[in-house]
Amino acid sequence: MLQPVWSCILALLGVFIFHVGEVRSQCWESNKCTDLSSEDGILECIKACKMDLSAESPVFPGNGHMQPLSENIRKYVMSHFRWNKFGRRNSTSNDNNNGGYKREDIANYPILNLLTGSDNQNTQQGIMEDEAVDRQDSKRSYSMEHFRWGKPVGKKRRPIKVFPTDAEEESSEIFPLELRRELSLEFDYPDTNSEEDLDDGELLDGPVKKDRKYKMHHFRWEGPPKDKRYGGFMTPERSQTPLMTLFKNAIIKNAHKKGQ
């Protein structure tokens, strides 16, 4: 009865020793593997070898590849990634020593150790979100410095000085200073009747009087020339009749034809 059991145990021990390269010397050097004459000693030696095995070399024939990584290996792997570290990139020289810290350091605080596992995960997620928002704000402020509305560079905007005229000085007591700018923008446009009576040559060649208001003859909205009025098709060679008179005559002719 004992020979099959001993053969199975020795076979398992041989499999462990064969698949474990570096751990084999550690198993034989331990005190638990010195006594292999009894079944209990062999089982203790197997347990010692199993404890020394890492997750990178799973236990055979078990399901060691399904087991999670150990804490030391997880720290080693996560330390290579950028998101494992916190801290602003544009930190000052005073914060160089305390600028970056790892995720595992947060979980080692004594206050956080009192909380449960779910609360600890929630706090870590909240800290990660806050740090991500701060990092985005710092990057946004850095990029916005290049634009005018982020950080104005150069001369500041100077206030516009308004000097009142002689006519505005008389009404300075009535209108406040803020309304004087609006008064300066009000132009007195010439009447159409006076322009029709005068020729273009007289308006341009005539001297400008001081008591007379300035007329903007060089602008388009001052008044169209005579050859451009009524759309340009009413030239003096054709007819001097206004456009409304032509429409009235056409309407009367159509009504007269319908009456016949």
Swiss-Prot record:
Residues 1-25 form the signal peptide. One of its GO terms (cellular component) is extracellular space. One of its GO terms (biological process) is regulation of corticosterone secretion. Belongs to the POMC family. Residues 104-138 form a propeptide. The lineage of its organism: Eukaryota, Metazoa, Chordata, Craniata, Vertebrata. The modification Pyrrolidone carboxylic acid is found at Q26. Pfam families: ACTH_domain, NPP, Op_neuropeptide. It is found in: Secreted. Keywords: Amidation, Cleavage on pair of basic residues, Endorphin, Glycoprotein, Hormone, Pyrrolidone carboxylic acid, Secreted, Signal. This is Pro-opiomelanocortin. GO terms for molecular function: G protein-coupled receptor binding; hormone activity. It comes from the Eukaryota. The modification Phenylalanine amide is found at F86. It comes from Pelophylax ridibundus. The modification Valine amide is found at V153. Specific enzymatic cleavages at paired basic residues yield the different active peptides. Glycans are attached at N90. SMART domains: ACTH_domain (SM01363), NPP (SM01364), Op_neuropeptide (SM01365).
